[in-house]
Amino acid sequence: MSCLPDWLAAGCRDGDAASHPTIRLRFRTATVHYLAEFDVVVVGAGHSGCEAALAAARLGCRTLLVTMNLDTIAWQPCNPAVGGPAKSQLVHEVDALGGEMAKITDRTYLQKRVLNSSRGPAVWALRAQTDKREYARELKQVLEATPNLTLRQGQITDIHLGPHDEICGVGTFFDVHFACRAVILTTGTFLGGRIWIGRKSMSAGRAGEFAAEGLTATLERLGFETGRLKTGTPARVDRRTVDFGVMEVQPPDPELRWFSFDPRAWVEREQLNCYLTRTTAATHQVIRDHLHLSPMYSGDIEARGPRYCPSIEDKIVRFADKESHQIFIEPEGRDTPELYVQGFSTSLPETVQIAMLRTLPGLEACAVLRPAYAVEYDYLPATQCYATLMTKRVEGLFCAGQINGTTGYEEAAAQGIVAGINAARLVRGEALVILPREGSYIGTLIDDLVTKEIREPYRMLTSRSEYRLVLRSDNADRRLTPLGREIGLVDDERWGLYQKKIAAITCERQRLETTRLNARDLPVHLAAKPGSITLADLLRRPGLHYGDLESLNQGVLLDAQVREGVEIEVKYSGYIERQNEQIERVSAQHARVIPADLDYERLSTLSKESREKLNRIRPRTIGQAGRIGGVNPADVSALLVYLELAQAGRLTPAAP
């Protein structure tokens, strides 16, 4: 059965599914020949595009994944690593919904470490150094083996609209056209990409690959606002020319942890070391002497770069009083001599880069295999999207990843799976899914993107979530796997494993809350006062862990994930309950829906700036309205009063 509109599907049933319908190419009509019919077309095969394509195909949609180079699918062009603060939570959540990133990482890691382990569980962050070639190869194999999914090399330049401004197809640079109901744009840094080394530049999405030309003009003709952003990547050096003996070893953690909640994806393997060195006074002097050659400081690049991943020249300028900066030396794979110089991103000329690198302890004789460079690219401010990631202007057009203004593989994957789910649901005539910000980091990420006017690359941080104590890595499956199951991305075996885990956590929590120990049976340092104490109250004491219960012969044999989940839920139960109560209180007010056709210009109680912002962004709820820059608490209160009066029938929606 065709999922295309009747007027288009009728023309796609002849012969080899080719058709010659007349479609609208914005301001003009044209007759095109559709080579094939799909339900969903995904443009770009980076981390966002891969998750989007897999989600749509697994939900039964005939999906086409179009990439400019089939050999660089799921490539990690910058740091070959997954996870880190806030990013690991995103990876766990993608996995909980039924995505792929966590599984691939658990098969291709070179090293794993838990960051912030000395702090509370809300900010624990698993990080993996990955083998970039193995990662790309493994994920490509998954894509190629997925039913309903077709991979094709090409460059999409045209988006075809039907009579009601709905998606009906796409066209390539070489005039090959595909009919479809939904399009997901995951263009990364390729959209109008230009790379810079010193004062010289060339058109490229990344080093050695063409930029995507033509699509930006199409989007602008469709009425979308576009902008420019910038990012960069450091040089790669030859490990055979590096002296690791003068560096600080960064070994993997002794206890192996996993990104995926599915044990079927876990692969134990030998891990490698990373290394730490630091910049020196000589490094800083070389940079200062050549700062005028940086395209960022000469004015050649005007696009904004990522605030939380600055270039080394930015660090030297912004933190002029700092004597040294950490630089991590990380392997890119098991079968390559290339090392990634983390923290040393730059766009200075290549000869200057070599001089800079050779001032670092251990790199005095290093050979550069690939120079660092900056890349600027086009993006669409995501306030033009709903929280479903479908654009407000064109039904069936979704955006995910760097085109929405984000930076990072994890942020891209998180948006990709949401866009893929919703594109499939649109095609199937089902309600689209919105993840609330209080329920996940993915929800927080998307809410920020579609609400706030972002003019620099957005990176997920734990501080961006008001509810990080309940949005932990360990409970991502408890928060999102039921939704993944309902949507259709969690299979029976995975669901069975999830239910078994939940039952084990519930059972052990009940045991800890009901089992009491007499103070006489406890070591002196634990017997605080006479009487008895539950195991749960004992576990809540500072410095005590589940392992201490085992030393008292009061533990039971539990899976590591279950044990950690139980300990966190018990130990922080008071804080968690208070945050859940806060979420309920805030959600009741913030979830209040604003009429889609409300004319803010007629609400004289709102400030002028507020009316302009609200009319442009069109927030869905009171909570979203309050997070828009320029909308202050007084404006939110006035809006609430208006809605209350309108609901009570004391004024008409058309008159304030």
Curated annotation (Swiss-Prot):
Cofactor entry: FAD
Q: Where does FAD bind?
A: 44-49
The record's Gene3D superfamilies line, in alphabetical order, gives: FAD/NAD(P)-binding domain, GidA associated domain, C-terminal subdomain, tRNA uridine 5-carboxymethylaminomethyl modification enzyme MnmG/GidA
Please list the residues that bind NAD(+). Answer: 305-319
Highest taxon listed in the record's lineage: Bacteria
Please verify whether the record's keywords include Cytoplasm: yes
Asked if the Swiss-Prot or TrEMBL record annotates the protein with the keyword Repeat, the reply is no
**What Gene Ontology cellular component terms go with this record?**
cytoplasm
Q: Which GO terms describe its molecular function?
A: flavin adenine dinucleotide binding
Cite the entry's keywords alphabetically: Cytoplasm, FAD, Flavoprotein, NAD, tRNA processing
A GO BP term here is:
tRNA methylation
One Pfam family cited in the UniProt record for this chain: SAM_GIDA_C
Q: Where in the cell is it found?
A: Cytoplasm
Q: Which family does it belong to?
A: Belongs to the MnmG family.
* NCBIfam families according to UniProt: mnmG_gidA
Assembly and interaction partners: Homodimer. Heterotetramer of two MnmE and two MnmG subunits.
Instruction: Please explain the role this protein plays, according to its UniProt record.
Output: NAD-binding protein involved in the addition of a carboxymethylaminomethyl (cmnm) group at the wobble position (U34) of certain tRNAs, forming tRNA-cmnm(5)s(2)U34.
Name the chain's protein: tRNA uridine 5-carboxymethylaminomethyl modification enzyme MnmG
Q: Which organism is it from?
A: Gloeobacter violaceus (strain ATCC 29082 / PCC 7421)
